[in-house]
Swiss-Prot record:
It catalyses: L-lysyl-[protein] + acetyl-CoA = N(6)-acetyl-L-lysyl-[protein] + CoA + H(+); L-lysyl-[histone] + acetyl-CoA = N(6)-acetyl-L-lysyl-[histone] + CoA + H(+). Residues 355-420, 506-549 are annotated as: Disordered. Pfam families: HAT_KAT11. InterPro entries: HAT_RTT109-like (IPR051236), Histone_AcTrfase_Rtt109/CBP (IPR013178), Rtt109 (IPR016849). It comes from Aspergillus flavus. Residues 366-377, 529-544 have a biased composition (Low complexity). The modification N6-acetyllysine is found at K263. The active site is at D261. This is Histone acetyltransferase rtt109. Disruption phenotype: Severely decreases acetylation of 'Lys-56' and 'Lys-9' of histone H3. Increases mycelial branching. Severely decreases spore formation and abolishes sclerotia production. Decreases aflatoxin production. Increases sensitivity to sodium chloride (osmotic stress), hydrogen peroxide (oxidative stress), methyl methane sulfonate (genotoxic stress), and Congo Red (cell wall stress). Decreases cell population growth rate. Decreases virulence on maize seed. Residues 394-417, 512-521 have a biased composition (Polar residues).
Length: 564
C-alpha cells in the first residue's frame, strides 16, 4: 500500500550525515501508455502498461557560504505499472566528480546513500495492495551517462565493472532488509506460508553472465554472509515465476525489454530468426520460437558471449522482488490478457514488437504507443509488446492450462487497473512526457568538463526546469541529520510472530524446550550442521522485542539426542 506520508526530502535527510547540505530537484512525468515490457505468447495480446518517468539531480554549493550550485549526481528511474505488477527500472545514474567541493565531506558514500534513499522513496510510494513490485537494473560500467564531459574531471571516480555491480548490490540491500525473508524452498507447509504471507517479504536476484554461482556470490553484499541458508535473501537466479505468468512460453516472452538494455539488443537480434508468417501458420510448435536459442538458460548462457558482456567486461542484472502481504515468492504471476479466437484455432502468427532505434546511446524513456480502451486486468512482471486485431475472448473463460503445478498463481483481480499515479510519489515538478523529454535533452546538451562550466550548466538546467513548469524556482534544500555510521534505513530484523492457531501444543511428557534446544545446538540441526539461538513458538508471540532476529523452531523439528 502506498505510504502517503513519505517525503523524499525527509527520507534523504535521515540517510545523509549530520550537517551535510544538498539541493535536490525531482522532476517526473504523468503516466502514459507505453510498449509493454514482455512480448506476448502467440495468440495473446499485450497487456496495458503505463510508464512514469522520474529524474533526480543533487547539487551542492561550490563555496562554503551559499555559493553557486553545482550538480554532483543524477539518476533516472522509469516506473512501469500493469494491473498486477509494478516495475521500478533504474535507467541511468551518473556523477560529475565535484562532490569534493562539499566542505567537510564525510567519508561515507553519499552517492550510494542518495541512490538508496531515492529508490526507497519510489518503492514505498508505488506499492499497491496485493500487487507485486520489482526493482530492476543492470550495472554496466561506462565513463559518463548523463553529464557530457564529466569524465575529464579529476575528481570523478569511475568504478570498474566488478566494483559497479557490488556497489549497486549495496544500494539495494538496505531496501531488501526492510522486508521479511522467505524460505528458499517452494515446498512449504501451512505454517511457513502463514508466517511469510503475514507481512511484506522480499528477495534479491542477481545474474552476471559469464560467472558461475560461486563467482556471483562474490558480488553479494557483506550482509548476505550472515543470512540463514534456509531463508536466503540473495539468489543467483532469474525470478522467472515471480515475473512471468506462463513459464512454458517461448524464451522471447520471458525476458523484459527495457530501453538501452543489453538484453533488449540481444532479443531484437534473435527476433530476426523468427519464422515467417507462412511457416508459423503451419506449425503451432514453432510459433514464437527462435532457431538458435531454445531455452531461457541458453539465453543467459549466450548473453555472456555478447560484446557488451565479454572482452573482459561484466554486466550485472539485478532484481529485487517485493511481495505484498498475502503473496510469497512461490506464488506465480498470472495474466488475463485476452486470447484471440482466430489465433487460438490454429493460425498462430508471431508478431515482432516495433521499437525505436535501439543502439548504445541511452534512449531515456520508453516508447509510447496507443492502446485499446479495453483493460487487461492482470499482468506479467512486465508486459507484452505487440497488439493484434481480432475478436477478443472474455478473460474469465480462459482455462488454467498454462498454470504451473508447483507454483500456485495469483488469482486475477478484476478490480485492479494498470493506471496508477500516487500523489506522494510525484516530483517537485510534474510535466507531460513531451516536456520531460525536453528537460532531459536540454541537460544532455550541457557541458560539465570543469567547475566553471558545470556551475553555468547547473544554473541553466534549474532555470529551464522552472520555466517549463512556470515557477520561479524548483527544488528542495535538504540537511542531513543521521548521526550513526550506518545507513538510517537499515532496520533490525524482527522475530516472526506465529499465528497461535497454528502452534502445536507440547505434550506433557516431552522435555522442556530449553533443554531440547541446548541438545540441538550440540548435535546440530538436520541438513544444517549448526543451530543458532532457539526459542519456543509460544514465546515468540509475547517476546518479540527481547531477542530480535532469532530463529523460531517448532518442537517437532528438533531431534532428540540419543542416550549414550
Amino acid at each position: 500500500m502506498s505510504k502517503v506520508d513519505v517525503d523524499l526530502g525527509d527520507l534523504l535527510a535521515k540517510v545523509l550525515p549530520t550537517g551535510v547540505k544538498v539541493t535536490i530537484r525531482h522532476i517526473s512525468s504523468a503516466p502514459t501508455p507505453c510498449t509493454a515490457l514482455f512480448t506476448p505468447p502467440p495468440g495473446e495480446e499485450s497487456e496495458s502498461t503505463f510508464c512514469e518517468n522520474h529524474f533526480l539531480t543533487v547539487s551542492v554549493n561550490a563555496d562554503e557560504h551559499d555559493g553557486p550550485e553545482i550538480i554532483v549526481f543524477g539518476i533516472e528511474v522509469l516506473v512501469y505499472s500493469t494491473a498486477h505488477l509494478t516495475t521500478v527500472f533504474v535507467s541511468k545514474a551518473d556523477s560529475t566528480g565535484f562532490l569534493h567541493l562539499l566542505k567537510n565531506a564525510p567519508k561515507v558514500s553519499l552517492i550510494r546513500r542518495i541512490s538508496n534513499g531515492f529508490l526507497s522513496f519510489l518503492v514505498q510510494t508505488h506499492q499497491r495492495p496485493g500487487v507485486r513490485l520489482v526493482v530492476s537494473l543492470f550495472a554496466r560500467a561506462q565513463n559518463q551517462y548523463l553529464f557530457p564531459g564529466s569524465i575529464e574531471n579529476s575528481g570523478k571516480h569511475v568504478l570498474d565493472d566488478r566494483g559497479l555491480i557490488k556497489w549497486w548490490c549495496r544500494v539495494v540491500d538496505p531496501i531488501l532488509r526492510e522486508y521479511e525473508p522467505e524460505s528458499g524452498s517452494h515446498e512449504k507447509g501451512l505454517l511457513d506460508r502463514a508466517m511469510e504471507s503475514a507481512k511484506s517479504s522480499a528477495t534479491a536476484f542477481l545474474i552476471v553472465p559469464g560467472c558461475d554461482k560461486f563467482e556471483t556470490r562474490g558480488f553479494f553484499p557483506g550482509t548476505a554472509k550472515s543470512d540463514d541458508k534456509e531463508r536466503p535473501r540473495w539468489l543467483n537466479s532469474y525470478p522467472l515465476h515471480q515475473l512471468c505468468d506462463n513459464t512454458d512460453a517461448p524464451p522471447r516472452c520471458l525476458v523484459p525489454r527495457f530501453p538501452d538494455d543489453p538484453k533488449t539488443r540481444f532479443l531484437l537480434d534473435l527476433d530476426d530468426e523468427l519464422p515467417q508468417k507462412l511457416e508459423a501458420a503451419g506449425s503451432k510448435e514453432g510459433a514464437g520460437q527462435w532457431r538458435s536459442v531454445k531455452s531461457l538458460d541458453q539465453f543467459w548462457e549466450m548473453m555472456s558471449f555478447r560484446q557488451e558482456c565479454s572482452a573482459g567486461r561484466l554486466v550485472g542484472f539485478l532484481w529485487l522482488v517485493i511481495n505484498p502481504p498475502g503473496l510469497v515468492n512461490s506464488v506465480q504471476m498470472t495474466s488475463s490478457r485476452p486470447v484471440f479466437k482466430e489465433k487460438a484455432e490454429g493460425s498462430l502468427t508471431t508478431t515482432v514488437p516495433v521499437y525505436d532505434k535501439v543502439d548504445s546511446k541511452p534512449t531515456g524513456t520508453a516508447v509510447s504507443v496507443s492502446t485499446d480502451s479495453q483493460s487487461s486486468d492482470t499482468a506479467k512482471d512486465s508486459t507484452a509488446e505487440a497488439t493484434s486485431g481480432g475478436p477478443v475472448q472474455d478473460p474469465s473463460t480462459q482455462t488454467g492450462s498454462l498454470s504451473s503445478e508447483t507454483h500456485p498463481k495469483v488469482q486475477p483481480n478484476t478490480d485492479q487497473n494498470a493506471f496508477y499515479w500516487p500523489e506522494a510519489g510525484r516530483g517537485h515538478a510534474v510535466m507531460s512526457e513531451e516536456d520531460y523529454k525536453t528537460a532531459i535533452n536540454f541537460l544532455l546538451e550541457q557541458d560539465f568538463y570543469n567547475e566553471k562550466v558545470s556551475i553555468a550548466s547547473t544554473k541553466a538546467w534549474s532555470e529551464k526546469v522552472a520555466s517549463i513548469v512556470d515557477q520561479l524556482w524548483v527544488g528542495q534544500q535538504v540537511t542531513g541529520r543521521n548521526t550513526s555510521g550506518e545507513s538510517a534505513d537499515k532496520h533490525a530484523p524482527t522475530t516472526n510472530i506465529i499465528n497461535t492457531g497454528l502452534v502445536r501444543k507440547r505434550k506433557k511428557d516431552e522435555p522442556s524446550q530449553a533443554t531440547t534446544a541446548t541438545s540441538a545446538q550440540k548435535e546440530g540441526c538436520e541438513g544444517n550442521g549448526t543451530v543458532s539461538t532457539a526459542v519456543t513458538a509460544e514465546a515468540s508471540t509475547t517476546g518479540t522485542n527481547e531477542s530480535p532476529g532469532v530463529n523460531v523452531l517448532q518442537a517437532n523439528l528438533i531431534r532428540k539426542k540419543k542416550k549414550a
